[in-house]
Structure formats: structure tokens, C-alpha cells
């Protein structure tokens, strides 16, 4: 809800009208979650399951249960592993839609980070205390989206850092949503990491279809309708 308000500024008079925007708790939590701007308004209500052109009732049921029964997922320490080989198949969009849905009714700390970004933050944290603090918030978040796991280069220090993160979350039953172009069985990570991911996640395989391409086309056509007179 937005109301118009005017402010009387000393030695100036009344300023122009501005919108007094009431920010909901859910909106506030989203802005602090590090979810990319393009996905801040993503929701399950707007997620286009129909674009896949095939039966996705199982995937849809799992996704809906994650929001509706999140407390049970949390108690069991279970997250999701959202997988599809196809780029643009909606993995990140679905993960953010789920997180936004949970934040609408639960006061929990949610964080989003891609694995490449996480590794870059880790390197900087050796010299930067602020980066170290941010990493700790990511590590301990009640719900973490770890985007694009499996895309990282195979190096010992990377395995070490990922194990520390995954092991902490596994041991403390912190809910994690992983997204990946690589199936769990094919992850080229330390076996201890993969074992923990298997234990802490429900598999949610999306169809091999780029819905991003379809949505981009629809958005472009809608935009052109408004600018071509």
C-alpha cells in the first residue's frame, strides 16, 4: 500500500509529493537475502509450469510442499537439488520463487549465493573482515540457495571450502537448495561432499527445455505492443 505524503522542509517550504511505501516483512527479508534483483519478485503463483509442455505434477507437488510444509523440511534438515542440463530451464527462478514464498510467512534468514561468487568471497575473506562476516551469514542462514554447484574448477582448496560449508549445514540441519546443470551422481566433487548432498536433499529434476527463451520472446512481444503505435 502506498500513500502520498508531503514534507515541510525548514527554509524551503513543502517538498514535492512522494510515495510513502510500506515495506512488508517479506519484502524486507528479500532485500537482505542477496537474491538477484531479477528474481526478487519471483513467486510460485507466477511460475509457468505449463511452458514445459509435459507432465510436471510431481515436480510441482514437491515445490508447493516446500513452501506449505517448510517447517517439516527444516526439522528434518531437508532441502532440494534442482537439476536440469539445459540452461534457462528455470532452476534459479524456481529456487528463488520457493525462497520468496517461504519468506512471505516465516521470519527466517535466507541467503542466495552462486558457487563462483562464494569462492571469490572466500578468497577475499582471508584479508577482508567484512567478507568473512558475510560468509558466516551465508554459512549459517536458515535457508541457503547455493546456485550452480558443479560449475567450479576441480581444485583441492575448492573441495575443502565447499566441504566446510556443506558439512556445517548438514550437521546443523540447515535447509539448502542447490541448483545445477549436473546430476548429483555426476558431480565431480569430493565424495564426502556428494554423500552429504545426497543425504540432505530431495531431487527435483526439471524438464530439458529452456523456458527462459519462451518467456523472453513473450516479454519482448508485449514490450513492442506498448512502444509501437
Mark where each language-model region is.
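A short, basic N-terminal segment
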Residues: 1-58, 65, 204, 208-229
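Conserved alpha-helical scaffold flanking the Walker A/P-loop in AAA+ ATPase domains
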Residues: 65-71, 121-144, 160-168
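A short, well-structured juxtamembrane/interface segment
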Residues: 55-78
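Walker A/P-loop nucleotide-binding motif
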Residues: 72-95
